[in-house]
Amino acid sequence: MSDVLKSSQERSRKRRLLLAQTLGLSSVDDLKKALGNAEDINSSRQLNSGGQREEEDGGASSSKKTPNEIIYRDSSTFLKGTQSSNPHNDYCQHFVDTGQRPQNFIRDVGLADRFEEYPKLRELIKLKDKLIQDTASAPMYLKADLKSLDVKTLGAKFDVILIEPPLEEYARAAPSVATVGGAPRVFWNWDDILNLDVGEIAAHRSFVFLWCGSSEGLDMGRNCLKKWGFRRCEDICWIRTNINKPGHSKQLEPKAVFQRTKEHCLMGIKGTVRRSTDGDFIHANVDIDLIISEEEEFGSFEKPIEIFHIIEHFCLGRRRLHLFGRDSSIRPGWLTVGPELTNSNFNSELYQTYFAEAPATGCTSRIELLRPKSPPPNSKVLRGRGRGFPRGRGRPR
């Protein structure tokens, strides 16, 4: 029994020594003062010996501060990488103190430095970007009201459709910014979006990416995918940082308690596409389903450009359509359609000629070697009841 007690006391001594080193104390004896245990013990003893006397003197002593009392003015003491009185991180408290969102401290989120420690992935991204640039068609754009436009007149079936509707949710978050180019901005409800004839312009195997906000759009977006003939297969989440302009209230909806700092882009699939066998059409697992980038100015509805990189890296189809695009989103390899465009250059016949010979970007041998692939299927092995013998009434001796 004495050995067990000695072992327990030794472990306790080591824990106190380690805690003292963590808190930067010179000796273990200072732990009581640093953690406040000494004051608690003294007050407990005083309470037991003379409760009435302490109660009488309580009013006079309550206004006096303890000489060694630590007063925290902010949460910098509790952040990662500092000498801390509490080894835990508290980025939520730091947001209350400074307005810096917790996601501001996630490292290596940019496209340039994301794969610095992964040379093969870095080479893969570089090669794919070069191939996409070389095979991209000339950018085309069409200024049109999508409520009255018959999308069948585009005369093409698309491999990828990116939809970026001006949701009423955005108007609730920023009611003061309801104009574009001096004209009132038209916001769409989900019934209008549901009536878009997206299924008619989607190829037999294709993908749709629908920005749906962060509230009721998650459910309504799934209804849209279902009506258009797509199956939801992924949810890309955009986490907005505020490193450049920290603050507490940027886009707060009426009667809202919390500020929304993320937005969702639902991904749908049409037809049968398997990543293990359809390497000529998709390259899976090249990017992640998370975008972390700085939010735009107040009232801006711009989405991160990284969504284009994710789509182009994933789907090798070259027929790409962007609905509700703007002048800032015109991009080689894409047909951009939207009411906020200032000009048009779309020609249906010319657009068709771009894909007559090569509807996909193709793939080089080096990209095929570097890209992540699905594991090979398990080989079928006959399994018996014991020692690997096949099933049967008997076995040869």
Swiss-Prot record:
Where mainly located?
nucleus
Upon gene disruption, the observed phenotype is: Flies have a reduced lifespan and exhibit multiple behavioral defects: flight and locomotion are severely affected and they spend more time grooming. They also display a mild held-out wing appearance resulting from failure to fold their wings together over the dorsal surface of the thorax and abdomen.
Entry's Gene Ontology molecular function annotations: mRNA binding
| Chain segments carrying region Disordered | 37-67, 368-397
Q: Where in the cell is it found?
A: Nucleus
Where along the chain is composition biased (Polar residues)?
Answer: 40-51
Q: Which PANTHER family match?
A: N6-ADENOSINE-METHYLTRANSFERASE NON-CATALYTIC SUBUNIT (PTHR13107:SF0)
Q: Which family does it belong to?
A: Belongs to the MT-A70-like family.
How does this chain assemble? Component of the WMM complex, a N6-methyltransferase complex composed of a catalytic subcomplex, named MAC, and of an associated subcomplex, named MACOM. The MAC subcomplex is composed of Ime4/Mettl3 and Mettl14. The MACOM subcomplex is composed of fl(2)d, Flacc/Xio, Hakai, vir, and, in some cases of nito.
Give the function comment from the record: Non-catalytic component of the WMM complex, a complex that mediates N6-methyladenosine (m6A) methylation of mRNAs, a modification that plays a role in the efficiency of mRNA splicing and is required for sex determination. In the heterodimer formed with Ime4/Mettl3, Mettl14 constitutes the RNA-binding scaffold that recognizes the substrate rather than the catalytic core.
Q: Could you tell me what this protein is called? A: N(6)-adenosine-methyltransferase non-catalytic subunit METTL14
